[in-house]
Amino acid sequence: NKGPDAVQALKQGKVDCVIIDEQPAKAFVEKNSDLKILDDAFADEEYAICISKDRSDLTEAFNGAIEELKADGTLDDIVNNYIGDDTKGKTPYESPADADHSKGTLKMATNAAFEPYEYYDGDKITGIDADMARAICDKLGYDLEIDDMEFDSIITAVSSGKADFGAAG
């Protein structure tokens, strides 16, 4: 169920291959020189943020913030900071000094095991999804709290109200 467990099983010969998203696969191969990525893609996927159907106001606010972040180049900068040989590490997202977080805190449910989307750097969850969520919250006037959980628990956490939204690579 977890990328690191699958990679360990592969290295131990318990499985013949691991099918995982491209960017986490690259992170695993970078740390395990005895592994390789095949040239043929298994499938193309799209990613999304999940928000409870009962929170249409939050969905609309997120969609608006995402459009603004696309238009001003912030989302591209976030992605480029984690993916790309020429840009990796060069455009880290920093909350604006004057960011207003007076509306409270939004909680993001994630599974921090899919570098570069979300992963631990020391004791802090970072990555594309974490930075994107932080940028959205900055636009909307909220602080961000990130809750790491099992991947299969994210939708339940969001639909039950334990988390305001979910994002997990």
Specify the residue positions occupied by each region the protein language model found.
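Soluble non-cytosolic domains of exported or imported proteins
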Residues: 1-4, 12, 19, 52-60, ...
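A ligand-binding cleft/hinge motif common to bilobed small-molecule-binding domains
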Residues: 7-43, 152-156, 167-169
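Hydrophobic residues within well-ordered alpha-helices
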Residues: 10-11, 49, 62, 136, ...
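Periplasmic-binding protein-like
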Residues: 22, 26-63, 66-95, 99, ...
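Surface-exposed patches in mature extracellular/periplasmic domains of secreted proteins
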Residues: 39-40, 76-81, 144-149
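Extracytoplasmic small-molecule ligand-binding "clamshell" domains
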Residues: 101-169
